[in-house]
Amino acid sequence: MSSAKTFTKHISFDDLAPSLIDDQATIIKNDSHHVGLNNHFLHIPPQFNPVYKNTLTGSHGSNDLATDESLDSPEDEEASSPLQLGTPTSTTSGVPHFYTQVFSPAAHDPSKSYLRSPSVERSRSESPMFRSRRRTSVRLPPPPKVSVLKKSRKAADEQGPIDDIDIGDLDFELERKMTKMTERNTQKNSGSRKGYTQAAFANLNEVEDRIETKSMVDLSESENMESSKKRSKSFAGMTDEELAKLEEFYISKGRSNKTKIDQFDFGEQVPVYLNTTESKTDSSNVTDPLAAIYPSRPTIVHNAISMTIDHPDYENYISNTKEKLNCKDKDDDVDLRVVSCYISGRRYTWSSVDWYVENLTRNGDHLVIITTIPEFEAKIDTLAYKEKRRHRLERMTSNTSESMTTASHSLIGPDLSSPLSTGIRIEAIHNEAKQTCSDILNYYARRLATKIVRISIEMVKENSTRSAIISATSLYRPSLQVISTVSANIQIKFRNGKVKLPFFLMKHFAMPAFVVPFEFIKPELLIKPRVDKDEQDNSDDLKTEVRKKERLQWLSALIRRTLENPFTKHKVVDSDDEESDSDESVTSVNEYFPISPEKKEEMEFFDKMGYVRPKPSRQVLLDDNTLMKYDSSGRKLTPIESRNSRRSSKRSSRIQFNNNGIYKVKSMVDDIYNHETASTPHIKTALKWDNEDPKMKFTSHPMRKTKSAGLSPRTSSTSSSSGQRKAHHHHHHHNHVSRTKTTESTKSGNSKKDSSSSSTNDHQFKRSEKKKKSKFGSIFKKVFG
């Protein structure tokens, strides 16, 4: 374990609002606003800005400018010092604040134009024309103390020293040195990074090259003229021998069914090259294949803030590890493993980074924290438009005197709906975003102080979370990703057609994904770990690690508490009489005080699963009064409010049940019985109903039961018992019908069963007729009575 060291800044990019300065300059130009000397967005050179305070001399820029110009002209020595109307007034914070601001009414007042006139520093004893001509020679700002430029004594086009080599007396070492020097110069002139090629010298346009090209062109033209002067010989002037040779030549070139290999002239064939020739019209063909080829469009197309900090030993650890592993520079990957985690303003999303810090981190990792920020420029513009419209409506509805008072107040204070105020809002959000990224980096740097890792945060300006994660993933190419969820049931689809983010990442990204439920991490230990009383004063919450022993004790206590049956509180009785008496007393008490459906559901769950369902960690967190809980609007939450709130999730993501409590009819239940057990209605199959309640015979799922609200407990219990007897009798009747159908299908029925089945059919027909007759009357009673 390496000692904790301070992380160092690596590389940071800020592209969250790149067009802020240009937009503000365009607004000032189009609206003809006054450009003050201390404009917040435009940089005025210090030689023209009297607000600029020179750090070297400790005086203002206007005094320095007047002093330098007084040395050039003897006229200025007799002149009085310029009128200091533009001296800055220091505020309570010590920051110079020039009173000719953009929002000040004096900036737009024509009667006070002298405040922004460039002649405030001009002396009365000299000509304004001469002074303005002298001002064209500007003075540069003071140079830095340490120059970043390398000093070189030779000129830019001056050649370096050349070693003289006597080629008359060459030995092996000298020849080898000359060969290396020639190759190095050729590679430098070719423009290639690795190796060299002569293709870069094909487009030279020197004098000797032009002369040589012209001579080659003249030679080719003369050859073409000579060949054109030669005319082909006619057949009339040929001899018989020439005609015979010409005939043989045509026969060898033509197509014939009777070709002879001895008559084929191989010397007249077009040469065939086996290597592939590149097309000259191919646009991808470059002069130097080893030269650097840059993409025609940018790789990073999203606006974001990217900050990175490294452990001081990170680079050395990576290089040493790669040397041990014999890694080849195929992909030019600097990091050994890149892990990405997504966080947002929702608290449960931070469980992904917390789980990585506690369980997955190792030396050489590159942790990339991805977060998003919406398109705040458009939202600020919409907000400014609404404020401007509201002020306009208030001005129209108010009286004349009130409108004059409002107009006078608007001149004194800045207009929040103006474009300049909008730019200040955008810059404030930008600065707050940078500060938030810095705080997140410092927080996890303190938690990972003992690990040699690199931490990066990428805040993408995007309204869509999916697009932001896609852009950041294509940029960093992580080896694995950790995502958190509030529910373990991630394969669900919402009413608006969207799916959960973990399911989207697991389905569409070709990389390992760790899905961390928020309830599996105890929030109390992550917020503030337990420490001893002696160490409480000298310990820090961020540096204190959660002890493994405390975690195991908490899990053991949870398992022990959930395995105890809280519903068996009566004592075990030895004799049968006492047991029967206790059962009768329990049943009598249950008749007067029936068990609630929630309690009965808990008892059935314990009989089925064998343990008590534990509370979710969110509920435990809300039940703890020592912690402060707030909602999105900043209001403090209580356990009752959090359970009744619309945004709170009432489902338990830890346990999934198959018990849905649906209604089932007889047609859905008949398949459970087999023909062997149909004759014994009270005996259940050993495969299905060994451990179930005898009252529930049709399905393994509990039936929904309705109870009249107007009855007393004793009446309701009596009616329920009579209902059970009727249901029991009806159950015997249906079993008898099923046995009748079975005997009819096997053709082994008797007359007694046939008579019972016929009577049953008649009884069912009468009931259906009676139901049809009473249907209209029941509807009439429901509507009118």
From Swiss-Prot:
Composition-biased stretches (Acidic residues): 66-79, 575-584
Region (Disordered): 53-162, 571-590, 631-657, 693-785
GO cellular component, one term: cytoplasm
Ranges annotated as biased composition (Basic residues): 725-739
Modified residues (Phosphoserine): 215, 667
Disulfide bridge partners, by residue number: none
Record key words, sorted: Phosphoprotein
Biased composition regions of type Low complexity, renumbered to the chain: 776-785
Biased composition (Polar residues): 53-65, 81-94
Any further remark recorded for this protein: Present with 1050 molecules/cell in log phase SD medium.
Name of this protein: Uncharacterized protein YGR237C
Taxonomic source organism: Saccharomyces cerevisiae (strain ATCC 204508 / S288c) (Baker's yeast)
